[in-house]
Every structure is written in structure tokens, then in C-alpha cells.
């Protein structure tokens, strides 16, 4: 029985990156051998075991054979006769198909039959064998790795293979859970725009997210968007979200906030009147199709509907500011307002020449919320009761008190309006 470190741990160590998790493959063993040594079986689809002390995963060497279309169409075989090279051959990229002995101290302890170390040095993402085409999820993984390893390029032959897979309909069989899983992970990488560049290049974006794909080539008003192209703007917004270390909820909202611009009638371009509501409708369809988590879809919905109003909030008076806060549910969920405003800031700064501009709308709306929060609703309700009011009338009094609090703040501070963002959205 031989044990080897494999996958991302070897790759990242060779790149000089931090290694947080280790994956191990075991050659020449049976499940009974592993159990006899105290390993805990946890694998459902193939034999995977937890180390009795470190709790790291140890998988028996295995081969995979295509038996149908899509992600689940595989027959897995494990046997003590499966070699290390056979196990590595089923992996997606050469940089992930390097193994090292458990006592790894130098290059002599590496087993690299597919040239992964060479591709690491050359900064190339290259598929291991033609069996890459058997799993369409690998298209998404390559795109995600491009967003992580920002100085790597996809090998021409690998890009061609991915194009063939899309053309042959393999991407049509991606299951929603895996699409969302890879999309979410890719959005959290250092340069998420590169994921979408790769997906566009191979044709997969039109399959998994046609609502995003159609944004390229759609013009915007150059006085507000010097980059003009909506797809280019979207990628700049995503990379700004990564630069500001935004959480997944914000990054997904950034991805989907302008979907409606892809359905703007041609005769009104480059204006996009009403695109916010169209974006919200398209967002709903995307979330249902990909089974997007509730917290992501809820934030994205508010951002899609309200980002234009937030950009123009410098023109709003007290009553309109309070209504905006109410539509954002900011009074009940002030922490979520921070994420809404962060997404809007990414949108405003994700334009050519705007990356270093301030976004004063954020401070203005937060200050308006603070004024609203200064109203003690219980006191207002008690006063309403003294006046013999109840039901909706109490709510109206609370709303009026909040508007007055914001009006007083605006008057006391003589707040100047932020620079108009126009159609920054």
C-alpha cells in the first residue's frame, strides 16, 4: 500500500501558495485494508476514508469510464491494481495531476507523468487527456481556475476541446447545482471576469447564463459609461467587487444587476429606461433555474430594482429617501443595506476612469438611515394611542416621524448632493 499527496495541495505548494487542505490517494489497498488501519469510510460514490487522527481525506486509486451524458454518467472502478498514473489520468488539468510521496522533500519525490510542473512554470491550464470531454463540469472548472490563477492562460488545444464539447451539447447536460457551485466559487476568485472570458470564448456562457452573454455588444450612453459596452461594464463591476473583497451575495448582485439591458429595444439604445425592473424579472428566472440560495437572490433583487435610485439619491428629499430605505427593508435589516450600498458602489466605480472615484451616496444613505433609527417608534405609537388612533394611522404617524427626522438632518447638515451618477447602473 502506497500513499501519495495529490491535487491542489501539490499544485499550490509548487506555486508557493498556502496549503490549507491535503488530499491523498492510496494505491494497492482495499476498503477492508483501510478500515483495518482505523480509517473511517465516508465515500458514497467511491471509497473515501478519513484519517483516524488528521481527519484528512484518503481516496483509493480509481478509474472512471463514461457511461452517459452529463455529470453523473460515469462508472467508477476501484481496485488494488489501479496504478497511480491511471488515477492521475482521470483528473482535469495537468497542474492538478501531480502526485508527491508522503515524505515529500524535493523534486525526486514528485510523480508527474503529464507535465503538470512544466505547465505550472509556463502558466498554462492544459487538460490531461481527451477524457476531459467526458465531464462538462470541467469547462466551468477551467474557467474558475482562470479567475484564480490570473496570470495563467488556457492552452489552445484545451480551449478547442471545450468548444467541441459545447458544440456537441455536453454543456446542455450540466446540472443546476454544479453550475451554481462553480459559479459561486468563481465569483469569489481574485479576478472573476476571467471566468466569464473563458466561458464566452468556448461558447459555454450562452448555454449556462444566456442572460449575461447577451450583454456584450449592447451600448450604453458614453457620457456615463466611457467603456460603452454593457458586457465590458459588467466585468469591470465584478472585478471591482473582488478588489473591495465583497462577499458572494454582493458579487452575485453585481453580476445580475443589469440583466435587463440585454432586452432594451434597439430603437431606444443607448438609453435603458426601465432596465431595473426588467433586470429583476430576468434575475428571478436565473435564480429559479440555478437554484440560487435565498440570501443571494434577495439581495440581488433589491440591487437590480434600486441601484438606479441609489445612484441618484443625491437628488432625493426626505420623503423619497425614507421610501427608498423602506423599499430596501433597511430599517429592519440595516446590515443588508451595507451590502446593497457596496454593490452599488462597485457598479459606479466599475466604469472606465471611475475606479478611484468616491461614492458619497453610501455615506448619505447611511446617515439618512441613522436619522430614521433615531425615531423611537414605541413613543410615536403611544402618542398615536393618546390621540385615539390605531391600525394604519399609527404606521402613517411613524412614517411621518421618520421623514421629519431625515428632513431635520438634511437641514441641520445642509447636505450637498453627491455628484450625479446618471445611468451608472
Curated annotation (Swiss-Prot):
Organism, as annotated: Acidovorax sp. (strain JS42)
Residues the entry annotates as binding CTP: 8, 11, 91, 141, 144
Listed PROSITE patterns: HD
Protein name, UniProt field: Multifunctional CCA protein
Note on how the cofactor is bound: Magnesium is required for nucleotidyltransferase activity.
Enzyme Commission number: 2.7.7.72, 3.1.3.-, 3.1.4.-
Positions annotated to bind ATP: 8, 11, 91, 141, 144
UniProt catalytic activity: a tRNA precursor + 2 CTP + ATP = a tRNA with a 3' CCA end + 3 diphosphate; a tRNA with a 3' CCA end + 2 CTP + ATP = a tRNA with a 3' CCACCA end + 3 diphosphate
